[in-house]
A protein has these predicted regions:
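Transmembrane helix-loop-helix hairpins in multi-pass inner-membrane proteins
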Residues: 1-50, 101-205, 279, 283-334
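Helix-boundary and loop/linker segments of multi-pass membrane transporters
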Residues: 15-18, 46-53, 84-87, 123-124, ...
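Hydrophobic alpha-helical transmembrane segments
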Residues: 23-24, 57-61, 88-93, 167-172, ...
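Hydrophobic/aromatic residues in alpha-helical transmembrane segments
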Residues: 32, 71-78, 116, 243-250, ...
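Hydrophobic faces of transmembrane alpha-helices in multi-pass small-molecule transporters and flippases
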Residues: 57-61, 65, 95-101, 131, ...
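Membrane-embedded helical hairpins/re-entrant loop segments and their flanking transmembrane helices
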Residues: 72-97, 250-265
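Juxtamembrane inter-helical linkers in multi-pass membrane proteins
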Residues: 90, 94-100, 195-216
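Alpha-helical transmembrane segments and their immediate interhelical loop/hinge regions
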Residues: 208-253, 260
C-alpha cells in the first residue's frame, strides 16, 4: 500500500436532504436524555459530581482510547486474513473517524462502518471484501459482548442479586446470544445467500443482491478460519475487559457499591442497548438503561445519570479526535 494513496482518499460525504429516520433518532435521543435529566434532582447531580474523585477519570479516558486501538488491531487482523495488510497505526485514525460518525451522525454503528468502508476501499478496491471484514468484526464483537455479559450476569445472580430485572437481563442476553450463533452458522449463511440472490432476481436488483450474497459468503469463509476466530475472539475478550475496567474505575471514583462482575454484566447490557439504532450513538436510551439497571442494586437516579455521563464521555473524546482526523484528511485531499 502507498502512503500517497491514503492521503488522497476522499472522506465520506454526508447525504443531503431530510432523513426522516435520522431525524427520529435525534428526536428520540435528545428527548430521552432531556426526560431523564428533568426527572433527576439537580442538587443530587451536583452532589454526585462533587463526591467524584476526578483524579481517577484519566484512567477511563486512556482505557477508551486503548479500546479503539484494540478494535483497529482486531480489524487489521481480519483484513490480513483476506490478504490485505494495514498497520494498526494506519487503521486507528479510520476507527476514530468511525466513532465520530457513530456518535454524531444518525444511523448508529452503520454510519461509522460506512465511513471505515469508504476509506479502506480507496486502497483495496473491493467493497464486498472490506464489507465482509466489517460484518465479521461486528459478529465476533457482539458474540463476545453477549458471552461475557451472560456469564457475568449468571455469576452476579449466584452472588445473591435476584432482582426480577436480572432474570429479564439473562433472558435478553441468552436470546441475543442464540441469534448470533445462528447468524454465524455456515448452514444459515449459505441459504441466506441463495435467498438474497433469488429475491434480487425477482425484484430486478441483481447487482445489489449479488454484492450482499458475496459479502455473506466471504464472512462464511472467514468463519472457517479457526485460527482467526480464536485470535479475534481473544482480542474481543481483551476489549471487553479493558472497556469494563474503565467503567469500573468511574464507579470507584464515584464510590458506587458496584463489584467488578456487576459492572461487566451491566455494561454488556448497556452496550447492547447502544448497538440498537434507536438514537444517535445510544444517547438518552443509554442513560435510561443505566438508571434502570443501577436501581436494581440501590443506586439512585442522580448517581446513575452521573455515572453514565462520566463513563461514556471518553467515547465522545474519541469521536472529537475522529472529527479532527476527518477534517485533517479532508484538507489534505482538497
Amino acid at each position: 500500500m502507498h502512503e500517497q494513496q491514503l492521503s488522497d482518499a476522499e472522506p465520506p460525504k454526508p447525504r443531503t436532504g431530510v432523513n426522516l429516520r435520522g431525524l427520529a433518532q435525534v428526536t428520540i435521543g435528545v428527548g430521552a436524555l432531556a426526560l431523564v435529566v428533568m426527572k433527576a434532582d439537580t442538587r443530587g447531580l451536583v452532589n454526585a459530581l462533587e463526591h467524584t474523585r476526578v483524579s481517577y477519570l484519566p484512567v477511563a479516558i486512556v482505557a477508551s482510547f486503548a479500546v479503539t486501538w484494540l478494535m483497529a488491531y482486531r480489524w487489521g487482523t481480519i483484513l490480513a486474513a483476506k490478504g490485505v495488510r494495514f498497520k494498526t497505526s494506519r487503521l486507528f485514525p479510520y476507527y476514530l473517524i468511525g466513532v465520530f460518525f457513530t456518535s454524531f451522525v444518525p444511523g448508529g454503528g452503520v454510519s461509522g462502518d460506512i465511513a471505515r468502508l469508504i476509506y479502506v476501499d480507496r486502497e483495496v478496491r473491493d467493497k464486498a471484501l472490506v464489507l465482509s471484514t466489517l460484518v465479521y468484526e461486528r459478529l465476533i464483537g457482539v458474540f463476545t459482548l453477549l458471552l461475557i455479559g451472560l456469564i457475568a450476569t449468571l455469576m452476579t445472580r449466584a452472588y445473591g442479586q435476584a432482582d426480577p430485572r436480572i432474570y429479564v437481563s439473562e433472558a435478553v442476553l441468552a436470546i441475543a446470544f442464540a441469534a448470533i450463533l445462528i447468524l454465524m452458522s455456515g448452514y444459515v449463511s449459505a441459504r441466506l445467500a441463495r435467498m438474497i440472490r433469488f429475491i434480487g432476481q425477482r425484484i430486478r436488483a441483481v447487482k445489489v443482491a449479488e454484492a450482499a450474497a458475496r459479502t455473506l459468503e466471504a464472512v462464511t469463509e472467514l468463519r472457517r478460519d479457526w485460527a482467526l476466530l480464536m485470535k479475534t475472539a481473544a482480542i474481543s475478550v481483551v476489549i471487553r475487559i479493558v472497556w469494563s475496567l474503565g467503567c469500573f474505575v468511574v464507579a470507584s471514583a464515584m464510590g458506587l457499591p458496584l463489584d467488578l462482575l456487576t459492572v461487566f454484566a451491566f455494561i454488556s447490557l448497556i452496550d447492547l442497548v447502544r448497538l440498537m439504532p434507536i438514537s444517535v450513538g445510544g444517547l438518552g436510551v443509554r442513560e435510561w438503561a443505566v438508571v434502570v439497571l443501577f436501581a436494581t442494586v440501590g443506586i439512585n437516579r442522580e448517581q446513575a445519570l452521573t455515572f453514565s455521563l462520566l463513563a461514556f464521555a471518553p467515547i465522545y473524546l474519541n469521536a472529537i479526535a475522529g472529527g479532527v482526523a476527518y477534517v485533517f484528511r479532508a484538507r489534505i485531499s482538497a
